[in-house]
Amino acid sequence: MLTKRALRTTDPYRRVLSRGFSVLNRPSPNYPGHVPLTTLERGALAVGSAIGSLINPRRADLIAALGEATATPYFIYRLRDVMLSDPTGRRILRNKPSINSKTLSVEYLRSLSPNTVGRTYVDWLDREGVGPDTRAKVQYIDDKECAYVMQRYRECHDFYHAITGLPVVAEGEIALKTFEFANTLLPMTGLSMFAVMRLKPEEKERFWKLHLPWAVRNGLASKAVINVYWEEQLERDVDELRKELGIEKPVDLREIRKIMRRQKKMAEEAAKTKKRY
C-alpha cells in the first residue's frame, strides 16, 4: 500500500500545471544542481538531446539529459511508486545511499570470492575500463525524491551490466537498455533502441535474434531491479541473486564478437591464399 506521501504526489500533471513559470521568473532550485525548466524548454531539451545522442552515442551528457527530459511528468513518478510499494525500495528512498568510489572500496571488492556480486561487479569494471564515478548528477527533474530515483537508476546501471555480463560496446548497451525499458519503462531506455540503426549488419542480426528476445523476456519477468539494495548484496553469490531476481544471463557477447573476428580473419587469409595460387 502506498504511503500518504505517495498518494499526495502520484498525480504529477496537477503538480506540474500548478507551478507555471517563464524564463523571466524561474523559481529557486529544489535541490543542489537543480535547473527548473518550462514545458517548452523541457520539450526542446528532449528533442535536441535525442538527436544529438543518436548522432553521437558516446555523449553521455546528452543521454543523461534525454533521460531526465522524457522521465517527467509521469514515468519517474511511476518508478518512484514502484520503490514505495516495496519494503527494500522504501528503505533505499529513506537512506538514499550513493554508489561511487568513496562509498564502495574497490580493494575490498577485489578481495571477495570470485562468484560474489561485489567481485563480479569490480571484475566487470576492470574488464571494461570504467569506474563508479562516471554518472552525471540529475539536474532537470523537479521533485527532489524523484531526482534521487533517477540518480539511483544511473548509479546502479553498471551493476545491471555486471550481473548480465553485457559489455559497454554499443551492441551490449542497446541490449541492456532494452532490458531496462521492459523493467523500468523509462522512455530514454526505450528510445535507445533507435541506435540499432548504427550497428553493423551482423550486429543488427544478433540484436533481433538474440538480444531483443532475451531483454524483453527477462525485463518483463524479473523483479524490479531498482529495488535491489546492491550495497547489501556484495558478498552474496551472484548466481543466487540472478535466480532470485529472475534474470537469465545472456550469451557472452564478447566471446561471440571474438569468435566472429577470428572467423573473419581466417576467411580473409584463405581468400588471400586462394588468390595467390
From Swiss-Prot:
Entry-linked PANTHER family: UBIQUINONE BIOSYNTHESIS PROTEIN, UBIQUINONE BIOSYNTHESIS PROTEIN COQ4 HOMOLOG, MITOCHONDRIAL
Name of the featured protein: Ubiquinone biosynthesis protein COQ4, mitochondrial
E.C. designation(s): 4.1.1.130
Organism: Ajellomyces capsulatus (strain NAm1 / WU24) (Darling's disease fungus)
GO cellular component: extrinsic component of mitochondrial inner membrane
GO process annotations (BP): ubiquinone biosynthetic process
Targeting presequence: 1-14
Binding site for Zn(2+): H157, D158, H161, E173
Cofactor: Zn(2+)
Location in or out of the cell: Mitochondrion inner membrane
Pathway: Cofactor biosynthesis; ubiquinone biosynthesis
Keyword Methyltransferase: no
Purpose: Lyase that catalyzes the C1-decarboxylation of 4-hydroxy-3-methoxy-5-(all-trans-polyprenyl)benzoic acid into 2-methoxy-6-(all-trans-polyprenyl)phenol during ubiquinone biosynthesis.
Membrane topology summary: Peripheral membrane protein
InterPro entries in the record: Coq4, Coq4_euk
